[in-house]
């Protein structure tokens, strides 16, 4: 019913429109006849028009704006708002579209904006934690249990009996006499009943002149609270002083540098330690005078020290061992070392499937002031590793059977960023002086010897020396003792940097040892055992129980453990964790990350273009505008392009009336301010200004 009432009204409007249309058409025709250029709203220059801007010279025309039908190769958004709206409408990131779809509800927009930003922050906080964990380079320890035939390790056994070489036997006897005199003067100890005290003192005056650095008695400084003036008292042992039995006295010997400008006392609170160290210091000097520190040993055969040797129930031979001499531990024998052509293999565990030795522990040519223990010293190590008897060995007790069971363990560590280890020592700044592979102990001892040669001018006899370097002897290097003890103190404090330079190897094989002891031989069996050993080795055992010791070394089991390190967080796991966090917080994929990168790139480009436009507008020369105005003023109106005024210009129908001010001619087109913005003018604003056309025609 409402439709019927509205239909006539619509027809009436159409009729009125029809009746008015001729009139409007007529007015339009009259307007065209009076004005050669119809009025158009001024929106800036049209497409293709040249713009005049301030500058140093004429500027090329602006590129023509693309129409709806054509598209440029590279396009950027005109504003941040347009870029943001395009991103939110087209991205695959969840929640971004909620920032623009609810723009008419500011509360929802604010809620989603805060939620989106919080989610974004939480995700990147998790990213930071993941990267922090990855850059800490954590490792995982993998433990594997393997079972196979095992290579038997090298075993080194020493006699604990420093040998008296024939070449230096007289000097050692002289040192013994000086030491006896020192013990008598300090402790009234009379070791030779055939000598009287007076004769002993007279001989000591002659003997002490042959050896420098005599032992002295030193008074310790008083406590600081006693109020007494501290003084470093010292007296020679040649003085008739009471026996050293007071706690405020120490025993030591003086060491000085080359020009005697600096001296110190190497002191000990125990007289036993002081005498042993003093004797050891002189023994090293005497031993360094040998032309060869490893001469042919006077123990003619292996049987003089080792009565029996069996491995896997088979007897040993000379091809299974090598020998060397240690300054403190005497003659040493290494079984199954790298020089052995056929390394021993263990295919069964147990005491009967290992190495069994019966050792002689008598000390017929013993140096009592140098070694105070009896028995033997043993060490288990790898085939290509030197035997550091001071660091890893232990003593065997005479009259006891020592059974040592072994378990092999291998450790493979990661180097580089994951750990401070070296593969073969080639990247360690210390030269290896040992004819063996790199180990941390080899590096540390080589480092000390290197510093000893550099600072003291000679080599320490306990470590290998390079070619062309002599061992230290105070007859040639009078101050080497001063230098050595100073260097030893710096070495203990790691002032030399040896412990920091020498890194552990990445691959290490260790042998875990556990020892068991039992009395051997028993009371019932000792008679026939000692008799058989004497007949077999053509040697009479004087002190039966204290003259022999037995050693058994075997694998407890053939299962060995391998501890290997692996990266806990790899690049693959890092990317997986990052993707999991991205999917958790935004439910997106890798392409969404590319969209984010594209957004950041567009933001940077828009910012750069805006800064460049502002820079040009601020620092462009203002003199160009006046010159441009004069150039346009001198240009005839007929020379304007047709697109600037599309209708042909003609003189006005009548001159202006008298008394009226004639219109001024337009000397320059108006500045195109609309072109300074980031957005292009609309398409319908390309029509020229009618008034401008008319004035230009004048």
UniProtKB/Swiss-Prot annotation:
A motif (PY motif) lies at residues 669-673. The record marks 205-206, 231-232 as: Cleavage by Furin. Glycans are attached at residues 190, 259, 320, 339, 424, 538. Residues 1-110, 611-698 are cytoplasmic. Its main location: membrane. Detected in kidney, lung and testis (at protein level). In the testis, detected within the seminiferous tubules but not in the interstitial cells (at protein level). Residues 1-70, 213-243, 637-663 are annotated as: Disordered. It is a multi-pass membrane protein. Ubiquitinated. Can be ubiquitinated at multiple sites and undergo monoubiquitination and polyubiquitination. Ubiquitination by NEDD4 or NEDD4L inhibits the ENaC channel through endocytosis, intracellular retention and degradation of its individual subunits. N-glycosylated. Residues 132-589 are extracellular. Keywords: Cell membrane, Cell projection, Cilium, Cytoplasm, Cytoplasmic vesicle, Disulfide bond, Flagellum, Glycoprotein, Ion channel, Ion transport, Membrane, Sodium, Sodium channel, Sodium transport, Transmembrane, Transmembrane helix, Transport, Ubl conjugation. Heterotrimer; containing an alpha/SCNN1A, a beta/SCNN1B and a gamma/SCNN1G subunit. Interacts with WWP1 (via WW domains). Interacts with WWP2 (via WW domains); inhibits the channel. Interacts with BPIFA1; the interaction is indirect via SCNN1B and inhibits the proteolytic processing of SCNN1A and SCNN1G and the activation of ENaC. Interacts with the full-length immature form of PCSK9 (pro-PCSK9). This is Epithelial sodium channel subunit alpha. The gene is Scnn1a.
